[in-house]
């Protein structure tokens, strides 16, 4: 069935086909019954007419056979008065001619008639049949020589010594009886013997011809069954009724009717039935159309509501008014529950979208702040690196001075004073270095805590995106259950689920980057703590050097030993400075990586904000 047809039209079409089929079957069944009834009535009618005609013909011949038999008996008793007996009024009025064929070849006839010269009855077939018969017998129709008319002879043997007496019966009466049967203009009757020869027929040209000449294509059998035959382009129904009680004559009354005329009533009935069927089908289809329109009204209301949600303002606050508890009422309740569930889901998605947007803004703000702190940390790290370089240069200078002190003992005081100044500068540099290391450690700790906060925020984003994904999946499932009507919801739900999935992936990437930043920050904190410890050691050594330089004037004799100690301490200080320099460079690299990670986080948060805005726009298309 065409998919573009409306459901009500499909119902109406199916109902129309059922009604048409039912009426067609009813008409065909009635046609079958009417045909059988007409055929049965026709068979009964023809059988009755055949039996009645057979009785009339038998009655026609029985009386005359009695007359001939009585005449034969009377002549046998009184052969001398044969001609007188043949002239009785009863015989003259009943027969066309009465005659006597004698065994000596003589022939008497009443009324008198001149026979051909040399006429010998003994050579005639009727004489031979009469002499051979044990009782009265009938001849087939033949032309009487005296009257030149078609007659049937009734013969009876007088005796073997006298001859045969007979009476010719004109066929006019028999023809009148047979031709009187026209069955209301539908057909005719005819007389035929058991050999199929036609004895009497309305068409005189067919008399004495066989049935095969009349019906060459299909010669009917002489039975009482109704047989269809073709004759002159017409279909005719034939039946035969035997004429019983006639001596030596096996005759049948053939009844022939035109099939089209016989079943003309059936054609009229068919036309009336077709007209009635068409009128009834039109009326029923019209009533069905009105009934379907009334019954489908709740569905039309539901369709308009769904179209308003799908193509209009997306108003999810509308509900259907249920007025019945039938299938449409159940469907309406289901639709209201579905819209209520979608309404709740859209509200939750809207709220979650606002939260995601706020979280994204907070993450962006935190990322910008972290970027600023990272820049500050980078600047200070560069300052620490410069100070470390100065500290290294100072240590090298101390080593040179210590070597010169060993070589130039004479200028120990001057060198001690210079060493005192260098130590003071060293102490000041160490103090600055210690302060910078403490500050860097605090900044890195702050960065670490910020990354922890960012990780918590990302966990919130991940949880929200997972909830959004579940809500979108539930909405898609409910839309799939709604079929074609929920296709718009399915598209929106699928878009929301994709956005949530992308948000979750971005949050996971940011989480991974932040975890790497946290690891780097923890390593930087450990390194700065170690650097601070080394710085404190250097400060202690520098203080010791200062104390020793304070007493250099009174302990000049110990300059060589002290210079060795200073050289050793200076070498250690140089190693520590180099280590600190390496740590500072590594901190700087980690800080750069942190900046790059923060930039990636910022970009991801910007994408998250855009997707949240898009989701908010989609949710805003519904009225909640």
UniProtKB/Swiss-Prot annotation:
Membrane topology per the record? Answer: Multi-pass membrane protein
* Cache domain segment(s): 36-254
What residue stretch is flagged as signal peptide?
Answer: none
Q: Which residues form the Methyl-accepting transducer domain?
A: 352-588
Where does the HAMP domain lie? 293-347
Its keywords, alphabetically, are: Cell membrane, Chemotaxis, Membrane, Methylation, Transducer, Transmembrane, Transmembrane helix
Membrane-spanning parts: 11-31, 272-292
Q: One GO MF term, please? A: transmembrane signaling receptor activity
Q: What is the lineage of its organism?
A: Bacteria, Pseudomonadati, Pseudomonadota, Gammaproteobacteria, Pseudomonadales
Organism encoding this protein: Pseudomonas putida (strain ATCC 47054 / DSM 6125 / CFBP 8728 / NCIMB 11950 / KT2440)
Concerning InterPro entries, the annotation shows:
Chemotax_Me-accpt_rcpt (IPR004090), dCache_1 (IPR033479), HAMP_dom (IPR003660), MCPsignal_dom (IPR004089), Sensor-like_sf (IPR029151)
Q: What happens in the null mutant?
A: Deletion of the gene causes significant reduction in GABA chemotaxis and reduces root colonization.
Report what the protein is called: Methyl-accepting chemotaxis protein McpG
Presence of keyword Cytoplasm:
no
What role does it play? Chemotactic-signal transducers respond to changes in the concentration of attractants and repellents in the environment, transduce a signal from the outside to the inside of the cell, and facilitate sensory adaptation through the variation of the level of methylation. McpG is a specific gamma-aminobutyric acid (GABA) chemoreceptor that recognizes GABA over a wide range of environmental conditions. Contributes to attraction to and colonization of plant roots.
